[in-house]
Structures are given as structure tokens and as C-alpha cells.
């Protein structure tokens, strides 16, 4: 039966998804490009296009300035994003491992996943079923070939066993008609089994086809889709043929990852080299001239006609060396992989650009407040926030990388270096057109990638000193992150914890609560018992039994902590109250008590509170220890 709420609800939240910002979205969010390495000028004012540019909002500690973008002060200005345009493409440190897996899984010649075509088609159908919510059908589809073939194989084994047995006895028997009848019966049973399996296969495939044609999602699946996609992604990666491509029969070299900054193409093993020479008469050098750019140390003759070149004797030592893969080359590999395997990969990822970064978002000024040296130390200087210092390092590495390339190519001389640098700030350099084999250029790019990694995830830093500085990921994750510390399970008004200690003199249905917890945990009680709540309001926040807040009918909440006694008496006057008093916990209040880990229902039980004025621990009767699986050696309960 429809209710009034059904008519009021116009839409429902079906689900959420997370993705990386692309370059267009970053450009739309940003209010200014940041490329000035100087945060402040000589007069200690924020510089234009600097890391503390006033267009990105006002610092939370600055009570006087106004934001140049919205015109608000530090109280009302939400802050505005900026961006740093990277000189060249950098790797996304959060997807580095996945990028390495894809590089190892693709063929460097035909640019396809080294998985048989039938298995790729099967994975595509299973992914579509999972996206629609038909997880059972997707799992059956993966097992269908296995159980059908196993049943047929078992029948064949039975047939062979019977035939063999009858054949041995045939030498002893004179009558062979019985043997022929058994053979015919076993063969007929096998044919019936195969026909039955074919019919089951056709019925199941028709059911799958109807699901895919209707394209109707299954709504009652919860978050199981995420787990299923994660599992099938691992299955896809485990299905990759180690070296020889099943599509073009070419042996592929191994791709090695060096930390979180570089990829190297290793030389072919001796076994693969012999296999290539025996099957093709040459080593396929299309690995990969079209994408090697200036890094390729191979001769590019005949690459337009056949894409292949024979191994020359003078290049034998060169072939044994590992080759550095630039980000531009890896980007080209991923683009070609997506061109061929887009049906499968688009079901797993947004696109290949999530593995790379051309622009880096800069957070608002209010989230990067400066810190002062302090009056006690006699240092009145302001120091940059840790993230501001990391962003400044990225800008310096960005400029150093650009100048290294410009000097290497002799694009500019000393007189017009600054002018050309200003003109090219918005132009990204294509590394495939530069002599990237230079160790200086590779080192400059590695420093840029390292600085980006430190800012986003300092655990990927190569140097120990950089690992100690918290990046954006460290700001969010683990127990000390803002999600668990500030948002998830925040114990403010209705929860508290302390160490437990035994007390045989309280009842089994009671729990002893220290007074400091009782003053913190409040209960929102409507103003009905006037005299009782009057005393609570007058006692205030620091005297038990008291109150911490008063909530008025319009939703305004007033704290009693800093009120004077006269203000408290004025607030306790009853004038058609309809107020809510957030009073302290008192003896007799029912509580839910829990000891983690919560393994079964008795781990959370209800008790009546007894306020203990001079205690610092939660007091509990011995008989409740078994339910909570607790002992008194320092366990905590809440």
C-alpha cells in the first residue's frame, strides 16, 4: 500500500562511484595556475601565481583579509582550488601497481592482452552480468565449461573401462555378441549425456542472452558488485600467458618497475630469443619502434614497410641492455591497448588516462595554514605548511625539468631563456621529440615524479627523509586519518570509553561510570520536569548533575560552559519553554555497553548507570566478564 512518503520522494540514491579528475575537470575547478616558486615577496605578501595566492581563498588564521575570488573573509570563504601544469606527463602514484600489471599483460607488438580470444569474450560477458547485478549467472558462466566437460570426461572414462574389461575377457569367451551390446549401450549413454549437456548449454546461453538484451539491473545485490569486479580483475591478470602472445606468436620481454618512478624493458631471455629465431628466423623488432620515440636504441629502417628489423652483430651488446620507458611511451602503449581491448577494459576502468597526470590540483589556502615560530623561542617568522612546502618543491622540480630540456635541445640561449620560459608555461613538452636518453633529463624528470609522489603518497618516496612527511594519503588513511579520527565513529555526546576494573558490590545489571564521563555524555531531555532541569542548567557544564547545552525551538543551541551564573538563571526561567536540555548522565540512565571486538550478541548489553564521583575507571561486576570476553588487565570498554 502506497504511503504519503512514496509520493513525496521523487528520486532515490541508487549508488555512488569514485574516479580521478581528468584534465578538463581540473581546469574547470581551478581559479589560477600556480607556477611561481616564491610563496611571499619581500614585504611578506602572497605572490601572484604563488602557492599562497589570495585567489585560492583566505587562510583560516587570517581574520582580516578578504578572498579575491568570492570576496568573503576566513569564516565564510570555502576556499578555491588552483592547479600546477606539469612540464611532462607523470605517473599517477595511486595506480602505479595496476599500470605495471597491464604493461606486463599486454603484447608489445599487436598491443592486445596476452589472453586467448575465447577467454576475453567470456570475461566481457561476465563483466556485463556483474555490472547488471547477476552475480550468480556470472559465476555459473565461469564454471559452466568445467562441470559440463568433467561429466563428459567421466563418462568417457567409464566407457574405456568397460571396453577394456570386456576386451580382456573376450579372449576367454567365445561369444562376442555380449561385448558388442555393452559397447553399444555405453556409446549410446555417452551420446545421450553429450546431447543433454548441449541442451543445458543452449538453455543457459539463451538465459544469458535475454538478460543482456533486456539490460535490466538487479537491484538487491548490495556492495557485492565491487567485490566481484575486484575478483574478476585478479582472474583476468592471472589468465595472462607468461611470454608468447597467443594472437601474434611473438615472445615479449619482461617489464620491470623501479620503485614508483620508472619502467624498464628487459632484454629477451635466451630461450625466448632461440624460439623467435627458430619460428620467425629473426627477432621481431616491432617491440616497439612505433612507440619507442627517441629512447629506442634500434635502427628504425624498414619500420614503415614491415615494422621489423633483423638483429645485427654490432647491436648484440646493445640488445642485452635494459631500456628505459618514458611516460610518453607508456602512455602510447596504454592508448594502443585501449584501442584494441576497449570492450573489456572499459568495463574495468574509466580510460587509460587515469594512470597519468598532466595537471596537479592545489588545495585551498585554508587547509594549508602557516605556523609561527612562537614568542617563547623568540622566532616571530611564519613557516609554510608541510603540504605547501611539498607543492613548492614540485614547482621547483617542474621548472628545473623544463630548463634541462631547453638547454639540452638548445632551444634558447641565456638572453631569451626567461622570455621563452614564460611563453611556454602553458605548453607541455612532448618527451618523444627530445633526446630523452640523456641521463640529466631522465634524472630531472625522476625528481619531478618523486616530488609528486611525496605530495600525494609519501610512503612511495625513495628517500627516508621524505617518507616521514605526511602526504595527502597519510592525511586520510589509517586510524590517525581524518575519516576515522574526525568523522567515523566520533565519540562526542553519546559515547565514552575507559579502562574497566572489578566491583563485586554493584548489581550485575549496573555499570559504574566515572563522573568525568558523566559530565561529557549528555542526554537531550525535553523540558517537562521543570525543577530538575532548572537545577541542571544552573549547575552548568562543570558541576554534576548539570547540563552542557540548551536547544531552542528554532534549532539554535547555546553552550552553558562559558555562561555566568546570572545568564544561567536567566536561561532557566520557564516561559513556555519547549526547550531541550542536554543534561549530564545520571544514576539510573540506561546505557549500551560494548567491548570490542564485537563477536556475538552478548558483546553489547544494556546496563543501568551508577555515577561514581571519585573514580577514573568503569566499574563492572565479575559475572559479566564471560559475555564481554573481558578481563581486568587493562581492557577498555565503551
UniProtKB/Swiss-Prot annotation:
A biological process term (GO) from this entry: DNA-templated transcription
Acidic residues: compositionally biased ranges: 297-317
Highest taxon listed in the record's lineage: Eukaryota
Entry's EC annotation: 2.7.7.6
Keyword field: DNA-directed RNA polymerase, Metal-binding, Nucleotidyltransferase, Nucleus, Transcription, Transferase, Zinc
Location within or outside the cell: Nucleus
Catalyzed reactions per annotation: RNA(n) + a ribonucleoside 5'-triphosphate = RNA(n+1) + diphosphate
Matching SUPFAM superfamilies: beta and beta-prime subunits of DNA dependent RNA-polymerase (SSF64484)
Keyword Metal-binding appears in the UniProt entry: yes
GO cellular component, one term: RNA polymerase I complex
InterPro entries with a match to the protein in the record: DNA-dir_RpoC_beta_prime (IPR045867), RNA_pol_asu (IPR000722), RNA_pol_N (IPR006592), RNA_pol_Rpb1_1 (IPR007080), RNA_pol_Rpb1_clamp_domain (IPR044893)
Sequence segments annotated as region (Disordered): 297-321
One Pfam family in the UniProt entry: RNA_pol_Rpb1_2
GO MF, one example: metal ion binding
Quaternary data: Each class of RNA polymerase is assembled from 9 to 14 different polypeptides. This subunit is the largest component of RNA polymerase I.
Role according to the record: DNA-dependent RNA polymerase catalyzes the transcription of DNA into RNA using the four ribonucleoside triphosphates as substrates. RNA polymerase I is essentially used to transcribe ribosomal DNA units.
Family as reported in the entry's similarity comment: Belongs to the RNA polymerase beta' chain family.
Protein name in the entry: DNA-directed RNA polymerase I subunit RPA1
Organism of origin: Euplotoides octocarinatus
Gene name linked to the record: RPA1
Amino acid at each position: 500500500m502506497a504511503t504519503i512518503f512514496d509520493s513525496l520522494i521523487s528520486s532515490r540514491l541508487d549508488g555512488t562511484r569514485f574516479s580521478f579528475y581528468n584534465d578538463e575537470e581540473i581546469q574547470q575547478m581551478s581559479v589560477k595556475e600556480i607556477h611561481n616558486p616564491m610563496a611571499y615577496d619581500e614585504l611578506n605578501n602572497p605572490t601572484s601565481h604563488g602557492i599562497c595566492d589570495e585567489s585560492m581563498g583566505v587562510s583560516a588564521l587570517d581574520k582580516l583579509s578578504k578572498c579575491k575570488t568570492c570576496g568573503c573573509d576566513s569564516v565564510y570563504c570555502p576556499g578555491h582550488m588552483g592547479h600546477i601544469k606539469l612540464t611532462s606527463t607523470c605517473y599517477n602514484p595511486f595506480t602505479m601497481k595496476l599500470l605495471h600489471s597491464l604493461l606486463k599483460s599486454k603484447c608489445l607488438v599487436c598491443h592486445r592482452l596476452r589472453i586467448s580470444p575465447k577467454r576475453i569474450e567470456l570475461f566481457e560477458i561476465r563483466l556485463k552480468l556483474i555490472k547488471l547485478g547477476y552475480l550468480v549467472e556470472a559465476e555459473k558462466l565461469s564454471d559452466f565449461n568445467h562441470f559440463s566437460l568433467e561429466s563428459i570426461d567421466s563418462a568417457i572414462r567409464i566407457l574405456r573401462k568397460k571396453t577394456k574389461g570386456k576386451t580382456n575377457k573376450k579372449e576367454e569367451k567365445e561369444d562376442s555378441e555380449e561385448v558388442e551390446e555393452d559397447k553399444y549401450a555405453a556409446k549410446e549413454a555417452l551420446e545421450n549425456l553429450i546431447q543433454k549437456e548441449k541442451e543445458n548449454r543452449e538453455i543457459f546461453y539463451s538465459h544469458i542472452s535475454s538478460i543482456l538484451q533486456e539490460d535490466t539491473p538487479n537491484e538487491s545485490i548490495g556492495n557485492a558488485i565491487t567485490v566481484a569486479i575486484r575478483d574478476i580483475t585478479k582472474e583476468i591478470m592471472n589468465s595472462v600467458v607468461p611470454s608468447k602472445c597467443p594472437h601474434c606468436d611473438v615472445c615479449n620481454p619482461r617489464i620491470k618497475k623501479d620503485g614508483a618512478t620508472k619502467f624498464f624493458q628487459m632484454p629477451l631471455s635466451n630461450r625466448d630469443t632461440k624460439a623467435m629465431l627458430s619460428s620467425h628466423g629473426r627477432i621481431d623488432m616491432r617491440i616497439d619502434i612505433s612507440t619507442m620515440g627517441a629512447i629506442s636504441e634500434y635502427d628504425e629502417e624498414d619500420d614503415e614497410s614491415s615494422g621489423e628489423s633483423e638483429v645485427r652483430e654490432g647491436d648484440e651488446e646493445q640488445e642485452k641492455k635494459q631500456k628505459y620507458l618514458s611516460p610518453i611511451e607508456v602512455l602510447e602503449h596504454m592508448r594502443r591497448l585501449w584501442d584494441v581491448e576497449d570492450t573489456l577494459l572499459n568495463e574495468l576502468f574509466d580510460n587509460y588516462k587515469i594512470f597519468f597526470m598532466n595537471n596537479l590540483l592545489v588545495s585551498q589556502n585554508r587547509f594549508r595554514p602557516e605556523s609561527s615560530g612562537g614568542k617563547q623561542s623568540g622566532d616571530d617568522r611564519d613557516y609554510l605548511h608541510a603540504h605547501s612546502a611539498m607543492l613548492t618543491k614540485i614547482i621547483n622540480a617542474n621548472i628545473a625539468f623544463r630548463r634541462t630540456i631547453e638547454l639540452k635541445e638548445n632551444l634558447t640561449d641565456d638572453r631569451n631563456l626567461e622570455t621563452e620560459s614564460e611563453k611556454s608555461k602553458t605548453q607541455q613538452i612532448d618527451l618523444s621529440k627530445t633526446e630523452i636518453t640523456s641521463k640529466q633529463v631522465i634524472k630531472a624528470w625522476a625528481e619531478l615524479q618523486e616530488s609528486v609522489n611525496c605530495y600525494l603518497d609519501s610512503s612511495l618516496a625513495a628517500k627516508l627523509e621524505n617518507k616521514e612527511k605526511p602526504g595527502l594519503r597519510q592525511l586520510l588513511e589509517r586510524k590517525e586519518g581524518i575519516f576515522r579520527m574526525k568523522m567515523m565513529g566520533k565519540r562526542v555526546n553519546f559515547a565514552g570509553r575507559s579502562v574497566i576494573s572489578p566491583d563485586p558490590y554493584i548489581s550485575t545489571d549496573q555499570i559504574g561510570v566515572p563522573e568525568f564521563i558523566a559530565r561529557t555524555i549528555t542526554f537531550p531531555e525535553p523540558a517537562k520536569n521543570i525543577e530538575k532541569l532548572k537545577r541542571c542548567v544552573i549547575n552548568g557544564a562543570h558541576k554534576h548533575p548539570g547540563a552542557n547545552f540548551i536547544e531552542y525551538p528554532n534549532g539554535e543551541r547555546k553552550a552553558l560552559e562559558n555562561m555566568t551564573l546570572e545568564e544561567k538563571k536567566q536561561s532557566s526561567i520557564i516561559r513556555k519553554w519547549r526547550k531541550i536540555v542536554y543534561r549530564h548522565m545520571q544514576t539510573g540512565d540506561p546505557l549500551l555497553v560494548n567491548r570490542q571486538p564485537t563477536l556475538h550478541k552478548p558483546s553489547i548489553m544494556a546496563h543501568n548507570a551508577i555515577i561514581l564521583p571519585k573514580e577514573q575507571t568503569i566499574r563492572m561486576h565479575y559475572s559479566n566478564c564471560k559475555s564481554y570476553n573481558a578481563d581486568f588487565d587493562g581492557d577498555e570498554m565503551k
